[in-house]
From Swiss-Prot:
Family classification: Belongs to the aspartate/ornithine carbamoyltransferase superfamily. ATCase family.
Any Pfam family matching the protein: OTCace_N
NCBIfam families reported for this sequence: asp_carb_tr, PRK00856.1
Annotated pathway: Pyrimidine metabolism; UMP biosynthesis via de novo pathway; (S)-dihydroorotate from bicarbonate: step 2/3
Record's keyword terms, sorted: Pyrimidine biosynthesis, Transferase
Source organism: Nitratidesulfovibrio vulgaris (strain DP4) (Desulfovibrio vulgaris)
Protein name: Aspartate carbamoyltransferase catalytic subunit
Length: 317
């Protein structure tokens, strides 16, 4: 497996999903499936990355993604080290580059970064010799979330993505999850619909390869899957929403609205959820929900990413 991966994986970094060819994407998902199977065993730890080191550099708050990467690294037997902005010299005014160079002097094999500035991951990848994984940069991209979402859908759909319809619902304007999912899923032939109030749609969305809706009933009709995005409550405080109750009335995914989708439609949510605001509790806990599947897929997918980057052929880009 390792020798095969060395010959097939050319990328030093994972910055966004559009850097992957279809063959590379399928190889990554197939690798994740192998690790998913390992994660179901009584003993989940394998020696695959023993002796490798992974630094988790989260300059923005995170619970799910950071924990998922930490678990992924440990299950591969890598040494993982965590650094948050509150515990780093960034808080004292040190530049991102100097902090990263200090970390690289420790000779890690992979640096996983989350940062509030769009482009931060690429900035580091262009300057550091170790592999860099973008765990979310501003509103720009969240490739590992899109990959685990794709993996979760593949568990249901198989490889028949072409012609499927996915509705992404919620705060699209400020969502790196939506941006990466649009890139990835449309490249596989999925028809993507975006649904949000006009104040939560991004500028230039008319140029995206998507259909845009402000009416949720129309957006979910005959959809194969619906992805709800967390509504950040500060959007209402910023005046982008008139009233949270009105938002819930118009944009909460309820049983009645899900009935408008296809009978076998699945529901996704990257978390954390605002139950009763963007998704009804009965939907979040329903058999159609893939929310917990996404959590399991996240560990397996991130194991695959760490494995591929840490064992790649030198000289890849």
């Amino acid at each position: 497996m390792q020798n095969e991966t060395r010959s097939l994986w050319p990328h030093k970094d994972l910055l966004d999903v559009d850097q992957l060819s279809k063959d590379e994407l399928l190889h990554l998902l197939d690798t994740a499936a192998q690790f998913h199977e390992i994660n179901r065993r009584p003993v989940k730890k394998v020696p695959t990355l023993k002796g490798k080191s992974v630094i988790l550099f989260f300059a923005e708050p995170s619970t799910r993604t950071k924990t998922s990467f930490d678990v992924a690294g440990k299950r591969l037997s890598a040494d993982t080290f965590s650094l948050a902005k509150s515990g780093s010299s960034l808080q004292k005014g040190e530049s991102l580059k100097d902090t990263a160079l200090t970390l690289e002097a420790m000779n890690p094999d992979v640096l996983v970064i989350r940062h509030s500035s769009s482009g931060a991951a690429r900035f580091l990848a262009d300057r550091l010799a170790c592999g860099v994984v973008n765990a979310g940069d501003g509103w720009h991209a969240h490739p590992t979330q899109a990959l685990l979402d794709c993996y979760s859908l593949r568990q249901v759909w198989g490889d028949t993505f072409e012609g499927r319809t996915l509705c992404i619902l919620g705060d699209i304007a400020h969502s790196r999850v939506a941006r990466s999912n649009v890139k990835l899923l449309t490249s596989l032939g999925v028809r993507v619909r975006l649904c949000a109030p006009r104040t939560l749609l991004p500028a230039g969305v008319g140029n995206w390869p998507v259909e845009v809706f402000t009416d949720l009933d129309a957006a979910v009709r005959d959809a194969d899957a619906v992805m709800c995005l967390r509504l950040q409550l500060e959007r209402q405080q910023a005046g982008l929403l008139p009233d949270l109750r009105e938002y819930s009335n118009r944009y909460c995914l309820t049983p009645r609205r899900l009935e408008l989708a296809k009978p076998e439609a699945r529901v996704l949510h990257p978390g954390p959820m605002n139950r009763g605001l963007e998704i009804a509790s009965s939907i979040a806990d329903a058999p159609a929900s893939l929310v917990l599947d996404q959590v399991a897929a996240g560990v397996a997918t991130r194991m695959a990413i760490l494995f591929l980057l840490a064992t790649r052929t030198d000289g890849g880009r």
